[in-house]
Amino acid sequence: MSKALIKFIRLSPTKARLIAREVQGMNAELAMASLKFMPNKGAKYIANAISSAVANGGFEANEVIVKSCRVDAAAVLKRFRPRARGSASRIRKPTSHILVEVAKAEVKSEEKKTVAKKTTTTKAPAKKTTSTKKATVKKES
């Protein structure tokens, strides 16, 4: 297992987490190919982190999977914008840390699985019961 950490990316962590969830558990080569066509700014940074983690471990991209992709909040740059009547409003410029862990893909052995057949018993249909009540007729007087 190898890791890559990219710190202080000028990107909102909430926006980067949307992309990080997409690639988690994917093959590294497939993840980098899908990130290449995403229009988001964070996709480029996460793709760089994945390729760096693959290189750190000395693996080939097609033989590893993205075990975890975590985006943490970093320091927030604070700026001020002048507003009316001498006041000012705060501008928050969030940054984030991206941590990617890749691991060697496990080869699954294909064993025959035996599935037990369910035994079903058929019930006899319920017998209809006939009503023994007699209709009462009112006599007109």
Curated annotation (Swiss-Prot):
Residues 108-141 are annotated as: Disordered. GO terms for molecular function: rRNA binding; structural constituent of ribosome. One of its GO terms (biological process) is translation. Coiled coil: none annotated. Keywords: Ribonucleoprotein, Ribosomal protein, RNA-binding, rRNA-binding. It comes from the Bacteria. GO terms for cellular component: cytosolic large ribosomal subunit. Residues 117-134 have a biased composition (Low complexity). Belongs to the universal ribosomal protein uL22 family. Part of the 50S ribosomal subunit. This protein binds specifically to 23S rRNA; its binding is stimulated by other ribosomal proteins, e.g. L4, L17, and L20. It is important during the early stages of 50S assembly. It makes multiple contacts with different domains of the 23S rRNA in the assembled 50S subunit and ribosome. This is Large ribosomal subunit protein uL22. It comes from Campylobacter jejuni subsp. jejuni serotype O:2 (strain ATCC 700819 / NCTC 11168). The gene is rplV.
